[in-house]
Amino acid sequence: MIIDRLFNEVEKKGNVCVGLDTHLDYIPVNLKEKYQDIDEILFEFNKEIIDKTYDLVPVYKLQIAYYEAYGIKGLLGYKKTIEYLRSIKKITIGDIKRGDISSTAQMYAKAHFEGEFEVDFVTLNPYLGFDSLTPYLKYIESGEKGVFVLLRTSNPGAKDIQYLKVSPKDEYLYYIVGDKLNEIGVKYRGSCGYSSIGAVVGGTHIEEAKEIRNRYKNMFFLIPGYGHQGATGKDVSLYLNKGNGGVINSSRGIITAYKNYKDGDQRFADYARKAVLDMREDIQSERGV
Protein backbone atom coordinates (compact mmCIF):
# COMPACT_ATOMS: atom_id res chain seq x y z
CA MET A 1 0.00 0.00 0.00
CA ILE A 2 1.08 3.56 -0.66
CA ILE A 3 0.83 4.42 3.03
CA ASP A 4 3.25 1.60 3.88
CA ARG A 5 5.63 2.89 1.26
CA LEU A 6 5.44 6.40 2.73
CA PHE A 7 5.89 5.08 6.27
CA ASN A 8 8.98 3.13 5.22
CA GLU A 9 10.45 6.13 3.42
CA VAL A 10 9.99 8.24 6.55
CA GLU A 11 11.72 5.55 8.60
CA LYS A 12 14.73 5.75 6.27
CA LYS A 13 14.85 9.44 5.38
CA GLY A 14 13.04 11.41 8.07
CA ASN A 15 9.96 13.60 7.92
CA VAL A 16 10.84 16.46 5.55
CA CYS A 17 8.45 17.04 2.66
CA VAL A 18 9.83 19.43 0.04
CA GLY A 19 7.11 21.77 -1.18
CA LEU A 20 7.63 22.70 -4.82
CA ASP A 21 5.33 25.72 -4.69
CA THR A 22 7.28 27.35 -7.47
CA HIS A 23 6.67 31.02 -8.30
CA LEU A 24 8.66 32.72 -11.04
CA ASP A 25 9.80 35.28 -8.46
CA TYR A 26 11.49 32.42 -6.58
CA ILE A 27 13.65 31.44 -9.55
CA PRO A 28 17.13 32.94 -10.13
CA VAL A 29 17.35 35.38 -13.03
CA ASN A 30 20.12 33.42 -14.74
CA LEU A 31 17.90 30.32 -14.92
CA LYS A 32 14.95 32.31 -16.26
CA GLU A 33 17.18 33.76 -18.96
CA LYS A 34 18.41 30.31 -19.98
CA TYR A 35 14.97 29.01 -21.02
CA GLN A 36 12.24 30.62 -23.12
CA ASP A 37 9.07 28.82 -22.05
CA ILE A 38 7.53 28.99 -18.58
CA ASP A 39 7.11 25.22 -18.42
CA GLU A 40 10.83 24.73 -19.02
CA ILE A 41 11.77 27.35 -16.42
CA LEU A 42 9.51 25.83 -13.76
CA PHE A 43 10.56 22.27 -14.51
CA GLU A 44 14.31 22.90 -14.69
CA PHE A 45 14.25 24.80 -11.38
CA ASN A 46 12.27 21.99 -9.76
CA LYS A 47 14.44 19.28 -11.29
CA GLU A 48 17.67 20.78 -9.98
CA ILE A 49 16.21 20.94 -6.47
CA ILE A 50 14.89 17.39 -6.75
CA ASP A 51 18.25 16.09 -7.95
CA LYS A 52 19.98 17.65 -4.94
CA THR A 53 17.46 16.47 -2.33
CA TYR A 54 15.87 13.20 -3.47
CA ASP A 55 18.19 11.09 -1.29
CA LEU A 56 17.21 13.06 1.82
CA VAL A 57 13.41 13.20 1.74
CA PRO A 58 10.50 10.74 1.55
CA VAL A 59 8.05 12.84 -0.45
CA TYR A 60 7.49 15.98 -2.53
CA LYS A 61 4.37 18.17 -2.55
CA LEU A 62 3.31 20.42 -5.42
CA GLN A 63 0.71 23.13 -4.79
CA ILE A 64 -1.08 23.18 -8.13
CA ALA A 65 -2.19 26.83 -7.87
CA TYR A 66 1.39 27.97 -8.44
CA TYR A 67 1.28 26.23 -11.81
CA GLU A 68 -2.33 27.01 -12.75
CA ALA A 69 -1.51 30.70 -12.39
CA TYR A 70 0.71 30.45 -15.48
CA GLY A 71 -1.94 28.81 -17.64
CA ILE A 72 -1.33 25.84 -19.92
CA LYS A 73 2.45 26.28 -19.82
CA GLY A 74 2.38 26.35 -16.04
CA LEU A 75 0.38 23.13 -15.89
CA LEU A 76 2.83 21.59 -18.35
CA GLY A 77 5.59 22.44 -15.85
CA TYR A 78 3.53 20.72 -13.14
CA LYS A 79 3.04 17.66 -15.35
CA LYS A 80 6.73 17.43 -16.22
CA THR A 81 7.70 17.69 -12.55
CA ILE A 82 5.39 14.97 -11.28
CA GLU A 83 6.33 12.71 -14.19
CA TYR A 84 10.00 13.17 -13.35
CA LEU A 85 9.41 12.45 -9.67
CA ARG A 86 7.49 9.30 -10.50
CA SER A 87 10.20 8.20 -12.94
CA ILE A 88 12.74 8.21 -10.10
CA LYS A 89 10.31 6.43 -7.76
CA LYS A 90 9.62 9.38 -5.44
CA ILE A 91 6.28 9.72 -3.68
CA THR A 92 4.20 12.70 -4.83
CA ILE A 93 1.47 14.78 -3.20
CA GLY A 94 -0.74 16.90 -5.45
CA ASP A 95 -1.84 19.75 -3.20
CA ILE A 96 -5.12 20.42 -5.00
CA LYS A 97 -7.53 20.87 -2.04
CA ARG A 98 -10.51 19.82 -4.11
CA GLY A 99 -14.01 19.53 -2.67
CA ASP A 100 -17.17 19.25 -4.76
CA ILE A 101 -20.34 17.25 -5.36
CA SER A 102 -19.75 13.60 -6.09
CA SER A 103 -20.12 13.74 -9.89
CA THR A 104 -17.59 16.56 -10.12
CA ALA A 105 -15.34 14.95 -7.52
CA GLN A 106 -15.30 11.85 -9.73
CA MET A 107 -13.71 13.93 -12.48
CA TYR A 108 -11.20 15.49 -10.07
CA ALA A 109 -10.24 12.01 -8.88
CA LYS A 110 -9.80 10.82 -12.45
CA ALA A 111 -7.73 13.91 -13.31
CA HIS A 112 -5.26 13.49 -10.45
CA PHE A 113 -5.17 9.73 -9.92
CA GLU A 114 -4.98 8.86 -13.62
CA GLY A 115 -3.40 10.30 -16.73
CA GLU A 116 -1.16 13.32 -17.12
CA PHE A 117 -1.53 14.74 -13.60
CA GLU A 118 -1.27 11.42 -11.77
CA VAL A 119 0.14 11.61 -8.25
CA ASP A 120 0.25 9.26 -5.26
CA PHE A 121 -1.69 11.45 -2.80
CA VAL A 122 -3.98 14.45 -3.13
CA THR A 123 -5.27 16.95 -0.58
CA LEU A 124 -9.04 17.33 -0.21
CA ASN A 125 -11.49 19.75 1.40
CA PRO A 126 -14.30 17.89 3.25
CA TYR A 127 -16.70 20.76 3.83
CA LEU A 128 -19.20 19.80 1.11
CA GLY A 129 -19.76 16.60 3.04
CA PHE A 130 -18.27 13.15 2.98
CA ASP A 131 -19.99 12.14 -0.26
CA SER A 132 -17.47 14.51 -1.88
CA LEU A 133 -14.74 12.05 -0.79
CA THR A 134 -16.49 8.91 -2.06
CA PRO A 135 -15.20 9.03 -5.67
CA TYR A 136 -11.63 8.82 -4.39
CA LEU A 137 -12.23 5.63 -2.43
CA LYS A 138 -12.01 3.23 -5.38
CA TYR A 139 -8.49 4.50 -6.01
CA ILE A 140 -7.59 4.18 -2.34
CA GLU A 141 -8.96 0.63 -2.32
CA SER A 142 -6.41 -0.28 -5.00
CA GLY A 143 -3.71 0.34 -2.41
CA GLU A 144 -1.85 2.64 -4.77
CA LYS A 145 -3.37 6.00 -3.81
CA GLY A 146 -4.08 8.04 -0.70
CA VAL A 147 -5.55 11.35 0.44
CA PHE A 148 -4.86 14.00 3.04
CA VAL A 149 -8.09 15.70 4.13
CA LEU A 150 -8.09 19.18 5.67
CA LEU A 151 -8.59 18.83 9.41
CA ARG A 152 -6.89 21.55 11.47
CA THR A 153 -5.07 23.91 9.14
CA SER A 154 -2.21 26.33 9.77
CA ASN A 155 -3.75 29.60 8.54
CA PRO A 156 -5.03 32.22 11.03
CA GLY A 157 -8.56 32.05 9.60
CA ALA A 158 -8.84 28.36 10.46
CA LYS A 159 -10.59 29.29 13.68
CA ASP A 160 -13.45 30.97 11.78
CA ILE A 161 -14.96 27.58 10.90
CA GLN A 162 -12.87 24.76 12.34
CA TYR A 163 -13.34 26.04 15.90
CA LEU A 164 -17.13 26.18 15.78
CA LYS A 165 -18.72 24.07 18.52
CA VAL A 166 -21.02 21.36 17.18
CA SER A 167 -23.78 19.38 18.92
CA PRO A 168 -24.46 16.86 20.36
CA LYS A 169 -21.05 16.61 22.04
CA ASP A 170 -20.34 20.35 21.88
CA GLU A 171 -16.97 19.63 20.26
CA TYR A 172 -14.98 21.63 17.76
CA LEU A 173 -15.98 20.99 14.17
CA TYR A 174 -12.54 19.70 13.24
CA TYR A 175 -12.97 16.85 15.73
CA ILE A 176 -16.26 15.89 14.10
CA VAL A 177 -14.46 15.80 10.76
CA GLY A 178 -11.54 13.87 12.25
CA ASP A 179 -13.77 11.26 13.88
CA LYS A 180 -15.56 10.63 10.59
CA LEU A 181 -12.27 10.34 8.70
CA ASN A 182 -11.02 7.94 11.35
CA GLU A 183 -14.15 5.82 10.90
CA ILE A 184 -13.87 5.76 7.09
CA GLY A 185 -10.14 5.15 7.19
CA VAL A 186 -10.20 1.90 9.20
CA LYS A 187 -10.55 -0.34 6.14
CA TYR A 188 -7.65 1.38 4.37
CA ARG A 189 -4.97 0.77 7.00
CA GLY A 190 -1.68 -0.67 5.89
CA SER A 191 0.63 -3.06 7.69
CA CYS A 192 2.31 -0.02 9.26
CA GLY A 193 -0.91 0.68 11.19
CA TYR A 194 -1.71 3.96 9.45
CA SER A 195 -4.54 4.59 7.01
CA SER A 196 -4.21 5.82 3.43
CA ILE A 197 -6.83 8.40 4.45
CA GLY A 198 -4.72 10.94 6.29
CA ALA A 199 -5.24 14.50 7.46
CA VAL A 200 -3.72 17.95 7.10
CA VAL A 201 -2.88 19.41 10.52
CA GLY A 202 -1.16 22.76 10.88
CA GLY A 203 2.14 22.97 12.69
CA THR A 204 1.40 26.53 13.83
CA HIS A 205 -1.41 25.51 16.21
CA ILE A 206 0.35 23.30 18.74
CA GLU A 207 -2.10 23.78 21.59
CA GLU A 208 -4.19 20.84 20.32
CA ALA A 209 -1.34 18.80 18.82
CA LYS A 210 -1.00 16.14 21.52
CA GLU A 211 -4.76 15.64 21.75
CA ILE A 212 -5.08 15.29 17.97
CA ARG A 213 -2.21 12.80 17.85
CA ASN A 214 -3.61 10.74 20.72
CA ARG A 215 -7.15 10.80 19.35
CA TYR A 216 -6.14 9.73 15.85
CA LYS A 217 -3.41 7.19 16.47
CA ASN A 218 -3.84 5.50 13.08
CA MET A 219 -4.02 8.67 11.01
CA PHE A 220 -0.98 9.82 9.05
CA PHE A 221 -0.54 13.60 9.00
CA LEU A 222 0.61 16.10 6.41
CA ILE A 223 1.92 18.97 8.52
CA PRO A 224 2.35 22.41 6.94
CA GLY A 225 3.51 25.55 8.71
CA TYR A 226 7.21 24.87 9.31
CA GLY A 227 9.65 27.72 8.71
CA HIS A 228 8.12 30.77 7.03
CA GLN A 229 4.76 30.23 8.76
CA GLY A 230 6.45 30.07 12.15
CA ALA A 231 6.40 26.44 13.30
CA THR A 232 9.61 24.91 14.68
CA GLY A 233 10.90 21.36 14.96
CA LYS A 234 9.70 21.31 18.55
CA ASP A 235 6.19 22.32 17.47
CA VAL A 236 5.73 19.85 14.64
CA SER A 237 7.30 16.93 16.50
CA LEU A 238 4.23 16.92 18.77
CA TYR A 239 2.23 15.48 15.87
CA LEU A 240 4.62 12.57 15.36
CA ASN A 241 4.44 9.10 16.88
CA LYS A 242 7.82 7.53 17.63
CA GLY A 243 9.30 9.71 14.91
CA ASN A 244 6.81 8.64 12.24
CA GLY A 245 3.13 9.16 11.48
CA GLY A 246 3.61 12.41 9.61
CA VAL A 247 5.54 14.41 7.04
CA ILE A 248 6.37 18.06 7.58
CA ASN A 249 6.21 20.39 4.61
CA SER A 250 8.40 23.37 3.91
CA SER A 251 8.22 25.22 0.62
CA ARG A 252 9.73 28.71 0.57
CA GLY A 253 12.12 27.85 3.38
CA ILE A 254 13.74 25.30 1.10
CA ILE A 255 13.33 26.48 -2.47
CA THR A 256 14.23 30.12 -1.74
CA ALA A 257 16.95 29.40 0.83
CA TYR A 258 19.55 30.44 -1.75
CA LYS A 259 18.46 34.08 -1.45
CA ASN A 260 20.34 34.30 1.87
CA TYR A 261 23.70 33.72 0.18
CA LYS A 262 25.86 35.87 -2.11
CA ASP A 263 26.44 33.02 -4.54
CA GLY A 264 22.89 31.76 -4.21
CA ASP A 265 21.82 32.31 -7.81
CA GLN A 266 24.50 29.93 -9.04
CA ARG A 267 24.04 27.38 -6.22
CA PHE A 268 20.31 27.51 -5.45
CA ALA A 269 19.96 23.72 -5.44
CA ASP A 270 22.92 23.30 -3.09
CA TYR A 271 21.33 25.69 -0.63
CA ALA A 272 18.00 23.87 -0.94
CA ARG A 273 19.85 20.72 0.10
CA LYS A 274 21.41 22.55 3.05
CA ALA A 275 17.96 23.81 4.12
CA VAL A 276 16.61 20.25 4.01
CA LEU A 277 19.52 18.97 6.11
CA ASP A 278 19.06 21.78 8.65
CA MET A 279 15.31 21.15 8.85
CA ARG A 280 15.77 17.41 9.20
CA GLU A 281 18.27 17.90 12.01
CA ASP A 282 15.91 20.32 13.78
CA ILE A 283 13.05 17.83 13.64
CA GLN A 284 15.15 14.81 14.59
CA SER A 285 16.64 16.59 17.58
CA GLU A 286 13.12 17.11 18.92
CA ARG A 287 11.76 13.67 18.10
CA GLY A 288 14.72 12.04 19.85
CA VAL A 289 16.37 10.49 16.80
Swiss-Prot record:
The active site is at 97 (proton donor). GO terms for molecular function: orotidine-5'-phosphate decarboxylase activity. InterPro entries: Aldolase_TIM, OMPdecase_type-2, OMPdeCOase_dom, RibuloseP-bd_barrel. Its EC number is 4.1.1.23. Gene3D superfamilies: Aldolase class I. Keywords: Decarboxylase, Lyase, Pyrimidine biosynthesis. It comes from the Bacteria. It is an enzyme of class 4 (lyase). It holds the Pfam family OMPdecase. It catalyses: orotidine 5'-phosphate + H(+) = UMP + CO2. Pathway: Pyrimidine metabolism; UMP biosynthesis via de novo pathway; UMP from orotate: step 2/2. CDD domains: OMP_decarboxylase_like (cd04725). GO terms for biological process: 'de novo' pyrimidine nucleobase biosynthetic process; 'de novo' UMP biosynthetic process. Belongs to the OMP decarboxylase family. Type 2 subfamily. This is Orotidine 5'-phosphate decarboxylase. It comes from Petrotoga mobilis (strain DSM 10674 / SJ95). The gene is pyrF.
